[in-house]
């Protein structure tokens, strides 16, 4: 279902996201890739909004299950350049070998995955991340502030209809079972957007 949504909205996606991209997301993307090097997976690359922030000298693979979104990413890559491979595949079964990547990054990916898909997706990312590597996940959550939470609840039906996304995913809950140890969780925008940093638990990925 989500794949079909993104096939449908791909040509409008950047326009729909433009106010948030300019006012909120761009600084967060810098944080997401800060200090990373080597082989990096951008899981859920979408239209390629992260491409300008890929670390110099790194080899990045961007994956997405929507050909239409990847087409937009390819156009952006052609303008910007870089050592980037774009591949159509599913985060639940990427097709990569064990221990392939030094780092795995996912920005606003897990909020579009149903609750039942959280664990298998995390397990797959843990499998393809090197034991010495790390996984960084940028995600929304409901605010603890009653007023902000109320506003987010008003927005939630539209966000679910347009993007297949939700603010109520319990991604962190599944990490230990997926073979991941949470290293750090911190908010990057108020108390609604956080970055979760995790690493494979030795012998469990």
Task: Please state what every model-predicted region is.
Residues 183-205:
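Core SAM-dependent methyltransferase catalytic element
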């Amino acid at each position: 279902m989500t794949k079909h949504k993104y096939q449908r909205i791909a040509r409008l996606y950047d326009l729909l996201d433009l106010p948030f991209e300019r006012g909120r997301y761009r600084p967060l993307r810098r944080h997401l890739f800060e200090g990373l090097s080597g082989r990096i997976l951008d899981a859920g690359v979408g239209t390629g909004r992260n491409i300008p922030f890929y670390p110099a000298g790194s080899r990045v693979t961007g994956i997405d299950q929507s050909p239409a979104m990847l087409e937009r990413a390819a156009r952006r890559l052609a303008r910007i350049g870089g050592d980037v491979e774009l591949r159509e595949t599913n985060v639940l079964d990427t097709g990569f070998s064990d221990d392939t990547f030094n780092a795995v990054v996912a920005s606003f990916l897990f909020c579009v995955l149903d609750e039942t898909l959280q664990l298998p997706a995390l397990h797959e990312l843990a499998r393809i991340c090197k034991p010495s590597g790390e996984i960084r996940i940028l995600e929304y959550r409901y605010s603890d502030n009653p007023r902000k939470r109320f506003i987010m609840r008003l927005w939630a039906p539209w966000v679910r209809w347009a993007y297949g996304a939700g603010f109520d995913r319990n991604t962190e809950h599944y990490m230990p079972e997926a073979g991941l140890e949470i290293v750090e969780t911190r908010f990057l925008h108020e108390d609604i957007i956080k970055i979760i940093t995790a690493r494979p638990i030795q012998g469990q990925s």
